[in-house]
């Protein structure tokens, strides 16, 4: 008897499928029934294999471009290798005669599955399971509507094409730019990519507008008028104003001359006014249902959540709790045949026990009672549903959500309810008061019927202006006229919310109508990838977070200058993404051959590499700074060029990116002034390892790294007088001070050293502030520090630094949360295990010495 192998994308999905279909027995990491074998991937198991990374040295132009005749696959990591062995064995079982692709419905899910089958080298009939919800009913219904492999082939072709094109541009572009930047020695990794670089360009261009912005003074005139019923205010405006596209700072209420503004004040003071008033009804519909990008924007604006955090929370609500539909969607509409399911969902939310959604129960009950769920193109529209529909609650009610999960669920549930509520109704009043030939405008907006705004309470209503009444033909008196001097403001920096909007609407920056239409559906990246793109730019040091703002680094300015100077405009313009999305859509619709698309990508790759390889200028043209700090060697003027800060009067110069870390201009100024800077993180050794160091300008005016581990220097007497002690040494009780890259006991330096205590100011890329060292010395433990990076796995981790019994500094980790046990004995075991784990962690904490990764 033959069986069908089902491959899901994640173990949790495989478990849900086994429960929905029933009859399965678990066999280790897979399930089996009379008819099916059920296993899963763990996300992306395979990726396109890159050429060997350099161990020492640098990427060069010698082997570029890299355009393989065929793309090889390799496991992503060791864990992937083990899972692949299982899947290959199951795929090659003789009793497995067919395969069902149950990976996530979309391009990436298709790619994950196709790579696994390709790697296994099997050819068996394939069918496609297209899941839009993880409820058992939805899973069973999807199994009754399996799609054939021929139908899915265009999506598979588009998925492969996207992956291979991204690989070609990313690998070759990154290595070409890295080779160019590493010509003078060292290894300056310069990542570029089809989506990440245009995204970075958007932020860089905004920052340039902010940097070059010059504030302009302007004036407004505000007046207070007396009517029989009371006071009201108005603002002067020019009724003849015409918007000037070349000067967007112009407004009908702005006066650019103080003299002209004062003339209006003088003319209107104490004068009578005539009133003209128009009052009209206004309706405000609720926003559309959430797709992933709009949900990420809302969560960032309301709670400060990063796009990555929101995606993780929404994914957990979909997979683990099963209370939301598939989150990685770019549609804000529902299929027309889901009206009945939506009614049922609304009835669930209206029930007596709606779990986390209980506060919304009265609103859901109103929708049910009024029968507001009915066909409506604002909500149900097949033409606007892509692979997946909008994010909405499922028939399963939420229980035991974390605070963050509950916030995201409530956002979605409220939006879901609001689209079925009537529009909010306002009474909008515009009053024009004419005084001495001048016009003043007063506007009021009064909420008449809250409609959907009732679901949000006061959150969405704001402060409505209730205007005092003015009788017909009543004259008012000008009681007070105020002149306000103001200044124009620069554009706001991007937050994740506004950058997501810019990425989504990047098609507006494209001139070609067909490409703009292609990008109107996806923009830069997809809802599923935008969070990772932003995180990637942060991790590569191109962006940094300050509060909620995203600020480009000096490394970004360096990259923008390079790409502009080399003429590689394909990587900075969203038109490249627009063109690709247009063609990938054509592939999905069988309107374009995959091989034709890949030929075009190969040609583009060759052009990008050629421009970087053949550029023969000494520098790259750009907008460079002149430093205010004089040359430390001769006192001359120091100017920036593409590669260095160089004196215009002598031979002094320093690299702009020692150890692969780009100087901020302010850092260069400090280094020249004080001849010392740091400790700084973000350097990369020739072995590709991150390290921290102090930078110094030597007596010979050369730039040097100081790792704080020079025994010769420590053998000299050190004068700590005038310095503040951070606390007592945990080994000998003497005072601990800051000294170079370390915190040291005063008795651990000098010719008569008697103590060995020292602890790095940077440990595994985590900066240890003086405040935290004081806390460690006084209390025995720091606060929880969140930016350690493992030298083995290169992953971030959190830990406390603790004072050990031998006086050394070690790690202590947060105890892992244990799951609530069903039985009392289980709970006791879990508690015992937790206590033992914590005890072991304290006992076996490894010394946390600073990493010294010298560049020789």
Regions found by a protein language model. Name each.
Residues 213-236, 271-313, 495, 514-521:
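C-terminal accessory/connector segments of nucleic-acid motor ATPases
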Residues 138-223, 280:
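C-terminal or mid-to-C-terminal helical accessory/interaction module adjacent to the motor/catalytic core
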Residues 245-290:
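Metal- or metallocofactor-binding catalytic centers and their adjacent structured scaffolds
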Residues 1-171, 247, 251, 479, ...:
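Intrinsically disordered, low-complexity regulatory segments
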Residues 11-18, 35-42, 61, 77-88, ...:
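Amphipathic alpha-helical transducer elements in NTP-driven molecular machines
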Residues 184-187, 191, 203-257, 302:
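C-terminal helical "lid" subdomain and adjoining coupling/linker elements of P-loop NTPases
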Residues 2-5, 91, 174, 212, ...:
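Basic, low-complexity terminal or inter-domain segments flanking catalytic cores
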